[in-house]
């Protein structure tokens, strides 16, 4: 009797390729040989061609989604949208809340929710997960993408479109983010998720100079780590019309475009696509007038196309019933609606300026294709990081988390010195001195409704070395009206009484002193109405205000240093005499 273990690997692979990928867990648990085989070869390829395999976010959790496209017809009476299935992901990802997900050839990049500074890259086929820490927990208005260079080194792009810069994390060679400047056009708006194709990332963008909505395509090359030029779309439209980007079998890009007033829908597919060049052909054009109640949302929908059947499947939310719905549209304008599931907390939305952006719960720009990409172990990165820390300066830039000292004797800067605490971009801190003997730093932490103040003082301070001790820690929740600005305000401390006095200007321009003690004692003293008290300057798009309060020391110390008004003139005279003397010596030498 022939046993499964007697079969050749090629025959076993041929058999297992006919098993649905949803049964992969059962296959791996059945036989050690099959488990090893599945970690080195991609199975289930035959079944994947007949199924749509994707992912969706519901209630901030990741779910797998599967249904069969094999029997879909192009008439209204066909009912072959077979076996739709949505199941929760039962692994470590289910322990965190997820707001956004981005797909790249078998890998998922997940952005965690609630101001977490963690990203997760997940390979569903191998079951591998890689946690990545960002520089800060700022995700509002940030666009992400996952891609790779010519050597298949995977990288993460973190794109701050309106700020004009971007960050890159190389998953193979570093544990840090590199910052770059070089956006093709200042003021680009790019809040939609992009599409990954051949390792590059592409985005629909909106510019300030052209008031026609998503008016161009922007490509990013992970090999050169640069954006390409703005590429034109195959159609023109205004700001109230809908555009959406998708990927076709990892070979082409597709754009879905729906006009606002006529509800005419067009789908265009690329015939050539590179970060620096693009050409288009029309795939589908449908007059949606009989279905005017159907309006796709460019902030919350996604779609994919089937070139063989010439259909487009759009995933969106039925606004009347708040359900996840798949709309199947053919070349003749037929429409089929499939209710996938009831939406629970369907969208993560954020207000940026005067517009509210919603992030799609659907991650279905193309059908999932398994990947054999393996992540380097975190322990390996930690070992490398420890070696680098002994050879390099501190480069963590999560806010102002270091001190830089200038030595006027050597006329040089010292080393970058770390502060004794970590904080996020929402926290504020400011520097002071104590009787010109020590440094003090005050940090104000913002965590939900809990606000806390800490005061640290130096035990030792030199241009190249420092050490700290905690002087005061106060829960500031009972006095929530107190706010201080790290750019405008100042403070000093009294070591004997163990109090700290903050000087600040409130919203009505009143200079106020806040006296805070170790037992949460608080007293406010109105100093005076600060008329025209602040000197401000505009740098780029931001206005910086300089504090009128100069109280970084506990008291003024008199000085006998005299200001030499003639020092500059005397140096100039000496320099002139020296040049004249040198000139005379040269003339005498010639004679």
UniProtKB/Swiss-Prot annotation:
A Pfam family: FBA_1
Comp. bias intervals (Basic residues): 567-581
Residue ranges of every copy of the F-box domain listed in the record: 2-49
Positions of region (Disordered): 567-591
PANTHER family according to UniProt: F-BOX DOMAIN-CONTAINING PROTEIN, OS09G0372900 PROTEIN-RELATED
Protein name, UniProt field: Putative F-box protein At1g32140
Species of provenance: Arabidopsis thaliana
Higher taxonomy: Eukaryota, Viridiplantae, Streptophyta, Embryophyta, Tracheophyta
């Amino acid at each position: 009797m022939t046993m499964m273990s007697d079969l050749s690997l090629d025959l076993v692979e041929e058999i297992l390729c006919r098993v649905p990928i949803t049964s992969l867990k059962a296959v791996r648990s059945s036989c050690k040989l099959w488990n090893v085989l599945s970690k080195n070869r991609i199975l289930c390829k035959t079944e994947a061609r007949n199924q749509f395999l994707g992912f969706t976010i519901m209630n901030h959790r990741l779910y797998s989604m599967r249904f069969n496209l094999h029997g879909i017809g192009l008439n209204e009476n066909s009912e072959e949208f077979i076996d739709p299935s949505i199941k929760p992901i039962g692994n470590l990802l289910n322990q965190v809340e997820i707001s956004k997900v981005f797909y790249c050839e078998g890998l998922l990049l997940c952005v965690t929710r609630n101001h977490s500074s963690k990203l997760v890259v997940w390979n569903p086929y191998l079951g591998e997960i890689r946690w990545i820490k960002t520089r800060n927990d700022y995700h509002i208005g940030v666009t992400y993408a996952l891609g790779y260079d010519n050597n298949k080194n995977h990288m993460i792009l973190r794109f701050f479109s309106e700020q004009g810069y971007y960050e890159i994390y190389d998953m193979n060679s570093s544990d840090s983010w590199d910052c770059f400047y070089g956006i093709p056009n200042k003021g680009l708006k790019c809040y939609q998720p992009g599409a990954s194709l051949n390792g590059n990332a592409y985005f629909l963008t909106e510019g300030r100079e052209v008031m026609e909505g998503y008016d161009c395509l922007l490509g990013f090359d992970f090999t050169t780590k640069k954006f390409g030029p703005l590429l034109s779309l195959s159609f023109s439209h205004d700001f109230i019309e809908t555009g959406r980007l998708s990927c076709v079998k990892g070979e082409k890009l597709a754009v879905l475009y729906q006009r606002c007033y006529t509800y005419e829908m067009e789908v265009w597919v690329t015939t050539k696509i590179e970060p620096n060049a693009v050409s288009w052909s029309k795939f589908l054009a449908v007059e949606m007038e009989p279905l005017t109640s159907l309006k796709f949302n460019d902030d919350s929908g996604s779609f994919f196309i089937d070139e063989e059947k010439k259909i487009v499947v759009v995933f969106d939310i039925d606004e009347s019933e708040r359900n996840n719905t798949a709309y199947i549209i053919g070349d003749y304008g037929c429409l089929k609606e499939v209710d996938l599931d009831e939406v629970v907390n369907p969208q993560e939305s954020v207000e940026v300026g005067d517009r509210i952006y919603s992030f799609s719960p659907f991650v279905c720009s193309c059908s999932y294709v398994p990947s054999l990409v393996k992540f380097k172990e975190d322990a390996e990165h930690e070992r490398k990081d420890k070696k680098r820390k002994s050879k390099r300066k501190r480069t963590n830039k999560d806010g102002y988390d270091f001190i830089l000292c200038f030595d006027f004797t050597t006329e040089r800067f010292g080393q970058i010195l770390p502060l004794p605490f970590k904080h996020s971009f929402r926290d504020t801190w400011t520097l002071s001195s104590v009787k010109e003997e020590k440094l003090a730093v005050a940090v104000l932490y913002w965590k939900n409704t809990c606000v806390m103040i800490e005061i640290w003082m130096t035990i030792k301070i030199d241009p190249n070395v420092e050490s700290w001790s905690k002087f005061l820690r106060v829960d500031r929740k009972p006095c929530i009206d107190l706010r201080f600005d790290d750019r405008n305000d100042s403070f000093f401390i009294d070591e004997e009484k163990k109090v700290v006095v903050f000087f600040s200007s409130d919203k009505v321009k009143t200079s106020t002193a806040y006296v805070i003690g170790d037992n949460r004692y608080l007293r406010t003293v109105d100093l005076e109405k600060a008329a025209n008290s602040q000197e401000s300057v505009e740098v780029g798009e931001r206005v910086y205000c300089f504090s009128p309060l100069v109280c970084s020391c506990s008291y003024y110390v008199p000085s006998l240093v005299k200001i030499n008004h003639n020092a500059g003139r005397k140096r100039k005279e000496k320099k002139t005499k020296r040049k004249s003397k040198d000139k005379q010596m040269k003339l005498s030498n010639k004679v």
